[in-house]
Amino acid sequence: MITRPIAHTTAGDLGGCLEDGLYVFRGVPYAEPPVGDLRWRAARPHAGWTGVRDASAYGPSAPQPVEPGGSPILGTHGDPPFDEDCLTLNLWTPNLDGGSRPVLVWIHGGGLLTGSGNLPNYATDTFARDGDLVGISINYRLGPLGFLAGMGDENVWLTDQVEALRWIADNVAAFGGDPNRITLVGQSGGAYSIAALAQHPVARQLFHRAILQSPPFGMQPHTVEESTARTKALARHLGHDDIEALRHEPWERLIQGTIGVLMEHTKFGEWPLAFYPVFDEATIPRHPIESIIDSDIEIIIGWTRDEGTFPFAFDPQVSQADRDQVESWLQKRFGDHAASAYEAHAGDGTSPWTVIANVVGDELFHSAGYRVADERATRRPVRAYQFDVVSPLSDGALGAVHCIEMPFTFANLDRWTGKPFVDGLDPDVVARVTNVLHQAWIAFVRTGDPTHDQLPVWPTFRADDPAVLVVGDEGAEVARDLARPDHVSVRTL
């Protein structure tokens, strides 16, 4: 008879379960519930418990909007039930043997508004099983509960992540992990989070490597004043003149009001965001892109080829725009060079809306990511990749869309059922590309070098040799011509 696995942590004992050869602990609280007086306050260590706490089931996900029927691209991205008491993590380990396995910590994205570490497709069991490492996913506050300014502490979402890392460093040895071999892996907002953590005085001591998938480094944090204006907009949408009234609103109403804020502040041709990270001396004193350039952690950074199609493909205001409308939009960025900008971002037969998608993808992801690789290469090693596998959705019109690489890195396409953007992928392509990327991530977490039998060469990016690993249908090859000088020259005119 197999007994229930028990892990001993600084907060108390946890009772997990054994699943498919792994020891699993879900819904583990790493901080005090951020409710009551702790709403909009920095995360605090959990006070602990007596006895054995059940850790066999997920805790609630962070409150967030849920799109009826799901996103036309991602499907469902949240994982109900939702509740403010959401500061938990989930952990998979091959053994509780006191080993010194490397640790992978997954930080999900979702436009700073949606997502969950509880999603089945974000479970890190595939990494734990295939790489003999400890895999962890975390939850943190989102949207109005994580990003408001003027209500207490700033950037409480980031303090959640810091507290999670502190808990992991203090306790992962009890799960067979090595606190001195922690790698953070994040996508989109999760990758941006990693860069912010790299400059945090506590967090930067608690991890050693990072994989940044599609970090939107072109996103500028707001000032406290700009962010407080969004807080006031939320209060207004809920019928209040004073932001203090928000303290008494249930989280369901805060989420409801957030939809109004999002609609009010999303302009034509802009990536929709209701709230932003905030410049704050204690948490984000400078743009995260600067910290990741200067950081001594080992990193991989990458992007998908067509990041910018994600928010616009199913937005009729943009997807049905004609060339005149797009050039009018370009004039606000490039002035008299709008026509040249259009041609630079338009391929043969490109629809007008994809010009906007290319510009936004370039500004938010490609150029900023390339800058990180280029500037960091003069100081520290860095590897870069571009993911080119095209989503079958809408006959391939979205290209290699934002998020498309994740089923391959996680090696769990079967858990993405119902996600429209991956339906219809060629099984041979899936097998081939998964063998490359999933094992590369494992190798990097284990050794700092992502090469392996199926990927014998992945050179570091250097200013005099800008090598980027391009991952496509046939596998991976190294390219050195991805700077897209036509786009850069137009942007700097």
Curated annotation (Swiss-Prot):
PROSITE patterns tied to this protein: CARBOXYLESTERASE_B_1, CARBOXYLESTERASE_B_2
Active-site feature positions: S188, E307, H402
A Pfam match: COesterase
EC supergroup of this enzyme: hydrolase
Disulfide bonds: none
MF term (GO), any: carboxylic ester hydrolase activity
InterPro entries: AB_hydrolase_fold (IPR029058), CarbesteraseB (IPR002018), Carboxylesterase_B_AS (IPR019826), Carboxylesterase_B_CS (IPR019819), Type-B_Carboxylest/Lipase (IPR050309)
PANTHER family: CARBOXYLESTERASE
Free-text function comment from the UniProt entry: May degrade the phenylcarbamate herbicides phenmedipham and desmedipham cometabolically by hydrolyzing their central carbamate linkages. Conveys resistance to the herbicide phenmedipham.
Subunit description: Monomer.
Protein name according to UniProt: Phenmedipham hydrolase
Species this chain originates from: Pseudarthrobacter oxydans
